[in-house]
């Protein structure tokens, strides 16, 4: 089968591989729509996961089941499915401990284009199909559905990790697709003031659509200073880190109130350390909590997020700005995420 792959660090190309084989609990899926992610860019061009050779990329897809293993009960060939980017091994001890994302090892719930070939192939393998797939509604646009698989679950996880309370003040650093879903999740959880940090006009408009009450442009000065000025020197209750570089943790610690929570859902693909400023951390005694987590996956979460879209709690249409048609456009769509033109939020390829 054909697939678009990481050939090595800074190397991309089309390759031929054997079609994957389904184990007794697994499924083989043919992608119907895929979306490149900035995580793919970190993986290929920063070597964030190491020097992977001939690994098919991609972890955001909806598709059609073409084969199931003998023990799969709830899905059959022909079913159209949502495939979460995180597909845990549900028989692992880490799942029993409450951390499905790290089943059988740190970040090992994220398998596609990490521990095995991803979804940018003519077919891809899904482990534990009954536990990791969700039925795709017939009338849901494919470009919206594929946003559930990563952008929605990741952004919402930022709001979950931040433990946003009714009326909480929140800063969301980065208003790309994940940050936009962080804003949407914060609003749904009852946040009061939601401050988005970003600069591209198309993202600013989308941030306001999803619930941002204020927008700060990092090009207009240090964002900590801007947040403090906006809040009369008090800072905010919660910070969601959804973009930016290694400096964002220091910024988040500086702008969150004592007793506040910082939630990181950003993929830090380069650098050896993330620095915590000593004084702003109260010399280690400010009761400022720092959390970071890979998004949850699995069938139940995918079904719940899907239903939020079906019942009009969240409109995902603002996330997708570029739609391509045809397998051969995957490379073009991926490089778009690297170049980040001003009119881009997310690109989707319909297959």
Curated annotation (Swiss-Prot):
What Gene3D superfamilies does the entry give?
A: Medium-chain alcohol dehydrogenases, catalytic domain, NAD(P)-binding Rossmann-like Domain
Q: Which gene encodes it?
A: adh
Activity profile over pH: Optimum pH is 8.
**Cofactor(s) this protein requires:** Zn(2+)
Its Enzyme Commission number? Answer: 1.1.1.80
Q: What is this protein called?
A: NADP-dependent isopropanol dehydrogenase
Q: What molecular function does GO assign, one term?
A: isopropanol dehydrogenase (NADP+) activity
Which amino acids does the record list as binding NADP(+)?
175-178, 198-200, 218, 265-267, 340
The residues that the entry says bind Zn(2+) are 37, 59-60, 150
Q: What reactions does this protein catalyze?
A: propan-2-ol + NADP(+) = acetone + NADPH + H(+)
**Family designation:** Belongs to the zinc-containing alcohol dehydrogenase family.
Quaternary organization: Homotetramer.
Q: How is the cofactor bound?
A: Binds 1 zinc ion per subunit.
InterPro entries noted in UniProt: ADH-like_C, ADH-like_N, ADH_Zn_CS, GroES-like_sf, NAD(P)-bd_dom_sf, PKS_ER
Q: Which residues form the signal peptide?
A: none
Q: What does this protein do?
A: Alcohol dehydrogenase with a preference for medium chain secondary alcohols, such as 2-butanol and isopropanol. Has very low activity with primary alcohols, such as ethanol. Under physiological conditions, the enzyme reduces aldehydes and 2-ketones to produce secondary alcohols. Is active with acetaldehyde and propionaldehyde.
Keywords from the named record: Metal-binding, NADP, Oxidoreductase, Zinc
């Amino acid at each position: 089968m054909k697939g678009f792959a990481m050939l090595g660090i800074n190397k991309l190309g089309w390759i031929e591989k054997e079609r994957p084989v389904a184990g007794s609990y697994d499924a083989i899926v043919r992608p119907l729509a895929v979306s490149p992610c900035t995580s793919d860019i970190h993986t290929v061009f920063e070597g964030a996961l190491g020097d992977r050779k001939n690994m098919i990329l991609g972890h955001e897809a909806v598709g059609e089941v073409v084969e199931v293993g003998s023990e799969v009960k709830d899905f059959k060939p022909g079913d159209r499915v949502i495939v979460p980017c995180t597909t845990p091994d549900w028989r692992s001890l880490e799942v029993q401990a409450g951390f499905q994302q790290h089943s059988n090892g740190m970040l090992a719930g994220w398998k596609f284009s990490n521990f095995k070939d991803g979804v940018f192939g003519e077919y891809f393998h899904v482990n534990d199909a009954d536990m990791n797939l969700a039925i795709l509604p017939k009338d849901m646009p494919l470009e919206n559905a594929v946003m559930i698989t990563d952008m929605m679950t990741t952004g919402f996880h930022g709001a979950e990790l931040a433990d946003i309370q009714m009326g909480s003040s929140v800063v969301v650093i980065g208003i790309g697709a994940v940050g936009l879903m962080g804003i949407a999740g914060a609003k749904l959880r009852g946040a009061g003031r939601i401050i988005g940090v970003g600069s591209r006009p198309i993202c600013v408009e989308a941030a306001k659509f999803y619930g941002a009450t204020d927008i700060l442009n990092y090009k207009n000065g240090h964002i900590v200073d801007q947040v403090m000025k906006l809040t009369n020197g008090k800072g905010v209750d919660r910070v969601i880190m959804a973009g930016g570089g290694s400096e964002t943790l220091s910024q988040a610690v500086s702008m969150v109130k004592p007793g506040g929570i910082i939630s990181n859902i950003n993929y830090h693909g380069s650098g050896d350390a993330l620095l915590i400023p000593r004084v702003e951390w109260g010399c280690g005694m400010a009761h400022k909590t720092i959390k970071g987590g890979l998004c949850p996956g699995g069938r139940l979460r995918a079904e719940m997020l899907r239903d939020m879209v079906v019942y009009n709690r969240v409109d995902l249409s603002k996330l997708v700005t570029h739609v391509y048609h045809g397998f051969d456009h995957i490379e073009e769509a991926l490089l778009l995420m690297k170049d980040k033109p001003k009119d881009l939020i997310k690109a989707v390829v319909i297959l």
